[in-house]
């Protein structure tokens, strides 16, 4: 059994989702999911500290063995890119320094992995997450659903890598 943490990084909201899978990539359990929200009135350093503190709590509580993190994609606003990059850096460092295996996936890879189509829209992705994980509702906020998609992508990626290596 392998425990996977998927993370959708952001400065305002960081989505996270924890899944257990077997060595064949079969989802055994949706362990938990949620989000870390930061106050926009806080300074950048305070927001990053809040993200790290809460992420450490998630890591300590659920003890994942591997982590998948969404990579940055194109933003029209340069300030948004910078702040999300800072959050990603804090997240990557926290996971890596905790001894975890960390993999990064583009939005295209995540969509392709889950729907078979790299240009799937948000609604298609959310319905797939709900269906694959047998959830009653789509997790909210969207960042949480996105984090579960990252975890599913990581499970599919590790299974594909295992098949190639055998």
Located regions from the model:
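Phosphate- and other anionic-substrate recognition elements at nucleic-acid/protein interfaces
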Residues: 1-166
């Amino acid at each position: 059994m392998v425990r996977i943490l998927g993370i959708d990084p952001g400065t305002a909201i960081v989505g996270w989702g924890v899944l257990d899978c077997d060595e064949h990539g079969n989802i055994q359990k949706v362990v938990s999911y949620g989000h870390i929200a930061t106050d926009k009135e806080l300074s950048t350093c305070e927001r990053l500290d809040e993200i790290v503190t809460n992420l450490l709590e998630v890591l300590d509580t659920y003890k994942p063995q591997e982590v998948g993190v969404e990579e940055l994609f194109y933003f029209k606003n340069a300030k948004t890119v910078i702040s999300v990059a800072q959050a990603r850096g804090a997240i990557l460092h926290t996971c890596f320094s905790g001894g975890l295996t960390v993999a990064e996936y583009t939005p295209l890879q995540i969509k392709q992995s889950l729907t078979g189509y790299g240009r799937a829209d948000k609604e298609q992705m959310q319905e797939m997450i709900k269906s694959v994980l047998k959830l009653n509702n789509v997790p909210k906020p969207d960042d949480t659903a996105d984090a579960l998609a990252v975890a599913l992508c990581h499970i599919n990626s590790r299974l594909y890598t295992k098949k190639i290596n055998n």
